[in-house]
């Protein structure tokens, strides 16, 4: 074999060896930081505020959360179901069950966090005794929240329902309406904005707080603290056991969060843990 060919082959062998050694010495790519970030859908008040409160502590414990704020109840669950967002924190079990049934989704409750007592509000009246004949009452238009609103009126003697314990009662289930109330079914987020256009409105506390209403002071009627309508952290079957989700659930139910809720919301948001 010619010396030139021997030298050339030796050079190629050395080059290949260098490449192999370089590859062996290379560190594997670090996992994306996105794996340490949990996205959470929430309504602005109180849910996003509670999440902002625990965010620094979670970050110190190695978990970043990205809070996505919504002003309706449909998109948060839709985004979670379609895996654009990891979990949601804004809804009650009756709402979740109705959503799953109507939309064919399989979202699951992970942890109960707090109760927001629903209230009856008016810009015109000072008490239930002042409700005039034929008054117009605006109520939420989603099935579970409408049922909850009607139960509030029923339990306070304003109307009578066919089944006084049915959380999914609708207007057709009213069997007694001595005041001849007229009901307007509206999207929940719009109720504070129509308060001056109707006699009364039954408003979810998160929307009431966002509109600067104080449920414990401004509501003519309010659910008591034994309300079963707990707001839950909600996820999917494929992430309910994710360590990040469990860490978030634990962070939402600490003594510090309880104290924060009690001090900031003065009874309008009641810890459920």
Q: What is the role of each PLM region?
A:
Residues 24-27:
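Bacterial signal peptide processing site
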Residues 33-45, 63-69, 136-137:
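Short, well-ordered beta-strand elements
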Residues 44-68, 75, 79:
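Short, polar/charged alpha-helical segment
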Residues 45, 72-73, 83, 87-97, ...:
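Beta->alpha turn/N-cap motifs
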Residues 68-78, 165-193:
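Short helix-initiation/N-cap motifs at beta->coil->alpha
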Residues 98-110, 125, 197, 202, ...:
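Ligand-binding "clamshell"
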Residues 110-160, 258:
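A conserved helix-loop-strand patch within extracytoplasmic ligand-binding domains
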Residues 117-128, 230-242:
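A bilobed periplasmic-binding-protein/Venus flytrap-type ligand-binding module shared by bacterial periplasmic
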């Amino acid at each position: 074999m010619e010396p030139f060919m021997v030298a050339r082959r030796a050079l190629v062998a050395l080059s290949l060896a260098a490449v192999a050694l370089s590859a062996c010495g290379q560190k594997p790519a670090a996992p994306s930081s996105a794996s340490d970030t949990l996205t959470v859908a929430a309504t602005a008040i109180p849910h996003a505020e509670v999440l902002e409160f625990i965010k620094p502590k979670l970050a110190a414990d190695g978990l970043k959360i990205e809070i996505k704020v919504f002003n309706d109840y449909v998109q948060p669950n839709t985004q979670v179901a379609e895996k654009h967002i990891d979990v949601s924190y804004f809804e009650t079990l009756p709402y979740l069950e109705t959503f799953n049934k109507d939309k064919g989704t399989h979202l699951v409750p992970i942890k109960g966090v707090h109760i927001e007592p629903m209230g009856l509000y008016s810009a015109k009246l000072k008490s239930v005794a002042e409700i005039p004949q034929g008054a117009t009452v605006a109520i939420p238009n989603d099935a579970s929240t409408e049922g909850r609103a009607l139960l509030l009126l029923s339990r306070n003697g304003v109307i009578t329902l066919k089944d006084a314990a049915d959380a999914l009662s609708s207007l057709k289930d009213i069997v007694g309406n001595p005041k001849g109330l007229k009901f307007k079914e509206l999207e929940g987020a719009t109720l504070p904005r129509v308060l001056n256009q109707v006699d009364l409105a039954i408003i979810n506390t998160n929307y009431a707080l966002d509109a600067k209403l104080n449920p414990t002071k401004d509501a003519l009627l309010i659910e008591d603290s034994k309300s079963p309508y707990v707001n839950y952290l909600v996820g999917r079957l494929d992430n309910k056991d994710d360590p990040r989700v469990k860490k978030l659930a634990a962070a939402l139910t600490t003594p510090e969060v309880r104290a924060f809720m009690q001090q900031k919301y003065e009874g309008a948001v009641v810890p459920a843990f």
